[in-house]
Regions:
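Conserved catalytic-core segment of NTP-binding enzymes
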Residues: 109-127, 222-225, 243-343
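Walker A (P-loop) phosphate-binding motif
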Residues: 143-190, 288
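Short, high-confidence coil segments that cap the C-terminus of an alpha-helix
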Residues: 3, 73, 185, 234-239, ...
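Short amphipathic alpha-helices and their capping/turn segments at secondary-structure boundaries
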Residues: 25, 62-70, 222-234, 262-264
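Long, basic/Gly/Ser/Thr-rich N-terminal segments
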Residues: 1-134, 307-329, 340-351, 367-370
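Conserved nucleotide-sensing/catalytic segment adjacent to the nucleotide-binding pocket
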Residues: 199-248
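Flexible, glycine/proline-enriched loop segments at strand-loop-helix junctions
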Residues: 108-112, 160-167, 213-214
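N-terminal phosphate/diphosphate-binding loop that engages ATP/GTP or pyrophosphate donors
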Residues: 157, 175-217, 292-297
């Protein structure tokens, strides 16, 4: 199959790991990401993609001109765009996709677009004889008879969770996925969002769990059956699991869903090795000890390794509503200083945005499994 040259659009901080680990996308989709364009307000033309997330260098230069970048590609990879209905870049995105159709570029999405956009682009793509589709990967349908009890999962499970959501987990997961595959292991990857499907994995079935009109018990049994189906379908050597959502509350207003998906996961399967990412904040050792206790006894996810991300969660900015949480992204130098502070307190912690960390975690997993 011919490898198509792809333009990833729009590129924002959250999906930079797709550029950093673009070989995973090429291996799964036969799409080589050769261009990426961010919204104009980002001012990243000519900069390395790592400028957006302050992570390790990607050796991938960003473009600020959608039309020129599109001209060098065969298709558009449409990145997940939150809140289509009131995105400040909505009209710009729609205009660029229309231009792509007119230039006979295929368009591939992470998920179905909200209406009326999805129906509109389906019709528009058909008019110009181009493909407009959602890249999905599903496991075989569940056998309803398997919801009678919890079945054992025999494949080792390596889980990555975040103290807060969007705390460096996604990049860490892709780094671990690449490292495990390079060492020759068959890995079934379950990621926290639809991007997992671009790298040969599956999206965590959060939508299915949220729509189940039943008790926690049924949700837990459903998730267990889902993992059992995955194990039987792929017969992997290891399951790499990215748990969606956070695990610890930010404050009394922002509770990170009270660790909802972490709780369901810990009840549904036995995790063999757990990595917890934390924000770039100087916590007291006593607080981190309490977090470990909570992970072990509240979620049944004993923490084997802590990883420091380069993201800091800032206090809510709306005094009345107390609902908006902002995030700062720090350089490797700032993260290094924070690492030194933790070492002075004898807190063992790894740096999430670091290739050495991926190899270190894999070695620790091997050692634990014996």
């Amino acid at each position: 199959m011919r490898v198509q040259k792809a333009l990833l659009y729009p590129l924002v901080r959250e999906n930079v790991p797709l550029v950093r680990f673009r070989k995973l996308v090429e291996q799964e989709l036969s799409l080589e990401i050769v261009e990426a364009v961010s919204p104009p307000a980002y001012h990243v033309d000519g900069k390395d993609a790592s400028y957006l997330d302050e992570g390790e260098n990607t050796n991938f230069i960003l473009s600020g001109d959608f039309d020129k970048a599109m001209g060098r590609c065969d298709c558009i990879l449409l990145a997940k765009t939150e809140e289509w209905n009131y995105s400040e870049y909505l009209l710009e995105i729609v205009d660029h996709l229309i231009t792509a159709c007119k230039n006979h570029k295929n368009i591939y999405c992470t998920q179905k677009l909200p209406e009326p956009y999805h129906t509109f682009f389906q019709a528009y793509a058909e008019r110009y004889s181009v493909e407009f589709s959602v890249l999905e990967k599903k496991i075989p349908p569940l056998d309803i008879n398997r919801l009678d009890r919890i079945y054992p999962i025999h494949t080792p499970i390596l889980a990555v969770a975040g103290m807060n959501e969007d705390c460096g987990e996604f990049g860490l997961q892709l780094g671990l996925l690449q490292t495990l595959r390079e060492e020759g292991y068959r890995v079934s990857y379950v990621g926290p969002n639809e991007y997992a499907e671009w790298t040969g994995g599956y999206a965590f079935p959060r939508a299915e769990l949220e729509t189940l009109p039943y008790s926690f018990e049924i949700k837990i049994k459903y998730l267990n059956a889902w993992f059992r189906n995955l194990e039987e379908a792929e017969a992997p050597d290891v399951i790499l699991l990215g748990i969606p959502g956070g695990t610890m509350p930010i404050d009394e207003y922002n509770l990170n869903s009270c660790g909802y998906f972490a709780y369901l996961t810990g009840c549904a399967v036995t995790v063999d090795f757990t990595v917890l990412t934390i924000p770039c904040v100087e916590y007291l050792p006593e607080y981190l000890t309490q977090c470990r206790e909570d992970m072990k006894y509240r979620y049944h996810l004993p923490v084997d390794c802590l990883c420091l991300s380069n993201i800091q969660i800032t206090p809510p900015v709306l005094e009345e509503a107390k609902t908006i949480v902002e995030k700062d992204v720090f350089s490797a130098k700032r993260v290094g200083r924070m690492m030194d502070l933790y070492r002075e307190k004898d807190v063992e912690i790894l740096e999430a945005e670091n290739a050495k960390t991926y190899r270190d975690i894999v070695k620790r997993l091997y050692a634990k499994l014996g």
